[in-house]
Amino acid sequence: MHCPFCFAVDTKVIDSRLVGEGSSVRRRRQCLVCNERFTTFEVAELVMPRVIKSNDVREPFNEDKLRSGMLRALEKRPVSADDVEMALNHIKSQLRATGEREVPSKMIGNLVMEQLKKLDKVAYIRFASVYRSFEDIKDFGEEIARLQD
């Protein structure tokens, strides 16, 4: 690591500690040339897979798009923001765990429905009605019947 004071290349780590519930490392470093001390933080870079849309267009994963879709389904429902964040983190973890560089949007939609089903059945039906393009009341009834099984 370059020294921010004299830009020398040689620095040594004096102390390392986990911070942020173990999600990052704080390091105290000392320059071997000018002896100045400074702090660095290291965080793992978690790369999300690209999304393959139904029309075969590929685009970067967009967490805001995922969040807004879930929040739209959960609008005016008694679900806490913490529960929504936990569900989003679970979906992202599952996507990373595939190890794939690209995932179909259908997989993401199914993961969202899985999480919504656990959070709130009404939100699940709202999302499923759009995601699966329900065309009449019969489609709603069939999905509700599946929920009750």
Swiss-Prot record:
Superkingdom per UniProt: Bacteria
Keywords from the UniProt entry: ATP-binding, DNA-binding, Metal-binding, Nucleotide-binding, Repressor, Transcription, Transcription regulation, Zinc, Zinc-finger
Positions of the ATP-cone domain: 49-139
Keyword match Ubl conjugation: no
Cofactor dependence: Zn(2+)
Gene Ontology molecular function: ATP binding; DNA binding; zinc ion binding
HAMAP family associated with the record: NrdR
Function: Negatively regulates transcription of bacterial ribonucleotide reductase nrd genes and operons by binding to NrdR-boxes.
Family: Belongs to the NrdR family.
NCBIfam families: transcriptional regulator NrdR
Name listed for the protein in its UniProt record: Putative transcriptional repressor NrdR
Species whose genome carries this gene: Salmonella typhi
